């Protein structure tokens, strides 16, 4: 199982390849705001752990294992952003909140959050009911 740091790299590499068709060390460093030498070290570790294949000066490709986990990590991130929107978290806080919790939730918890997102999205009245509860709670606290 990858560490949280490894997950961040795999997720970013997956997104870059999906967007551009490739992921270079410099692109990964820029996206994660880290030094290229840090990326090289992590990419070598990910290669050793068979999440990707890295050839110096030639680039990298995700293995089947890397693609599978990358897809799941992107799904997790997107799902948590959806969940935050449903529960009414301010848009400007969503990204940082998701980054803060995504590595600490089990896949079972992610699946249950997925069920909850699906439940709310199946009927807009449910979201409105939640908003009503939130407004009532805000009025009580003021």
From Swiss-Prot:
User: SMART domains, from UniProt?
Assistant: HTH_DTXR
Q: Which HAMAP family match?
A: HTH_MntR (MF_00732)
**What protein name does the entry list?**
HTH-type transcriptional regulator MntR
What's the encoding gene here?
mntR
Record's family?
Answer: Belongs to the DtxR/MntR family.
- Gene Ontology MF: a single term: DNA-binding transcription factor activity
Source domain of life: Bacteria
Protein location: Cytoplasm
Principal location listed in the UniProt entry: cytoplasm
- Annotated organism of origin: Bacillus cereus (strain B4264)
GO cellular component annotations, sorted alphabetically? cytoplasm
Control of this protein's activity: DNA binding is strongly activated by Mn(2+).
- The yes or no answer to whether the keyword Ion transport is present is no
Tell me where in this chain the HTH dtxR-type domain is found. Answer: 1-63
Q: Tell me, in a sentence or two, what this protein's role is.
A: Central regulator of manganese homeostasis.
Q: Which keywords describe this protein according to UniProt?
A: Activator, Cytoplasm, DNA-binding, Manganese, Metal-binding, Repressor, Transcription, Transcription regulation
